Each structure stands twice: as structure tokens, then as C-alpha cells.
Amino acid sequence: MCAAIAAAPPVDEPGRGRDAFEKRCSGCHTLDKIKVGPPLRGVYARKAGTDPQFPYSDAMKSASVSWDDSTLDRWLADTDSVVPGNEMAFRLNDPVERANIIAYLRQLSSASKRTH
């Protein structure tokens, strides 16, 4: 029974994801404006390197990746494993924290689509 619990996928919690975003991501990202990195509101389900506000690297512009749970999880764990040669130097080892951040970004993207 303990092995089954340990093997269960992380539960995503957008509220905790917001807190993790503030702690882990806000040094370089905001939701709506360019900082060091692109704004992240609406990033979920968008093709990588396509926000018209941001001057992406050639690696990001030519990436054939769309941001979903799987690609965002791999990206947050090791950016170079998803888009080699990108300019984001970041790794987040905690799968629960990654799941929470992804849930937050997914929720923001869903809310953004409902208001437009």
C-alpha cells in the first residue's frame, strides 16, 4: 500500500502553485509583462517561443513544443531536455512543486480564454 501511495502522481493545487510561482518564477517572470523572461499568463497550450511581446532565442523560436502538463513538467525539471540551447537556466527538482505551478498556469490560461 505504501508503494502505491508513493507512486501516485502529484496532486496539483493552483493555490499552492501561485505561491510557488511567486517564490520560484517571479524573479524572471510576471504574468502580463516582460521581465527577464516572457509573461506567463496564457502560456498553457501555447506553442513555445510565440508570445509576440518577447524576443526569444533562435532555439525557442524554432522549437516544436506546445506547453501542456507533460512538456511543462519536463521543462521545469530540465529546460535543456525540452529545448536544447534555450537561455533559461532553471531546474526545479520537486515534482509536487512543478505540478502545482503547472496547475496555476493552466488555471490562468483557462481564465484568460473565458474573458477574451
Question: What are the residue ranges of the model-derived segments?
Answer:
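Short, solvent-exposed linear motifs at loop/edge-of-secondary-structure regions
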Residues: 1-3, 37-38
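Electrostatic cytochrome c docking/interface patches
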Residues: 2-21, 116
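Membrane-targeting and insertion segments and their boundary/processing signals
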Residues: 10, 42-46, 71, 75-79
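Gly/Gly-Pro-rich "capping" loops immediately C-terminal to redox-active cysteine motifs
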Residues: 14-18, 30, 34-68, 87, ...
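The canonical Cys-X-X-Cys-His
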Residues: 21-31, 101, 105
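C-terminal capping alpha-helices of c-type cytochrome domains
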Residues: 68-116
